[in-house]
């Protein structure tokens, strides 16, 4: 029984070791042309022409696939570059936001220190104002009494 080898949609019958080696090397290299040393058991010319047309079709499909693959690779490279640029912008923006946050935290610390100083001082001043008001009211009452007393005399 002769072994069958399939390359894409092409079936070939190989009955010699030399033919088998030719087919295997053709499959590896992508070269499906027949050499002069091919045995004399070639298929009829009509079958050979059909096989050559199929090989040509497979080669066209391979070229089309290569073009599509390259187009897809270029598209992916462009998308990657675009995404990389957007990522760089986002990182720069994040760095600016972090810097603003640090500055705001620093201002918050300063505000807290100022408030820590001012609140007790405000309390002291309120107490002092209260004492002064009380003193003023006491003097005002004393002056009012003295005026009434002098008018009564």
UniProtKB/Swiss-Prot annotation:
GO BP, sorted A to Z: female gonad development
Coiled-coil ranges (or none): 46-109
Pfam families recorded: DUF4715 (PF15835)
Superkingdom of source: Eukaryota
Keyword annotations from UniProtKB, A to Z: Coiled coil
PANTHER family in UniProt: COILED-COIL DOMAIN-CONTAINING PROTEIN 182
Official protein name in the record: Coiled-coil domain-containing protein 182
Organism: Homo sapiens
């Amino acid at each position: 029984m002769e072994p069958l080898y399939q390359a894409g949609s092409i079936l070939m019958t190989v009955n010699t070791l030399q033919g088998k080696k030719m087919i295997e090397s053709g499959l590896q290299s992508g070269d499906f042309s027949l050499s002069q040393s091919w045995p004399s058991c070639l298929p009829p010319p009509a079958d050979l022409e059909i096989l050559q047309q199929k090989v040509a079709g497979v080669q066209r499909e391979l070229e089309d696939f290569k073009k599509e693959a390259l187009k897809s690779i270029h598209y992916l490279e462009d998308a990657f570059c675009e995404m990389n640029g957007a990522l760089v912008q986002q990182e720069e923006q994040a760095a600016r936001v972090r810097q603003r946050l640090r500055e705001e935290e620093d201002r918050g610390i300063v505000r807290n220190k100022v408030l820590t100083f001012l609140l007790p001082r405000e309390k002291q001043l309120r107490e002092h104002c209260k004492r002064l008001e009380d003193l003023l009211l006491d003097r005002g009452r004393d002056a009012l009494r003295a005026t009434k007393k002098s008018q009564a005399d």
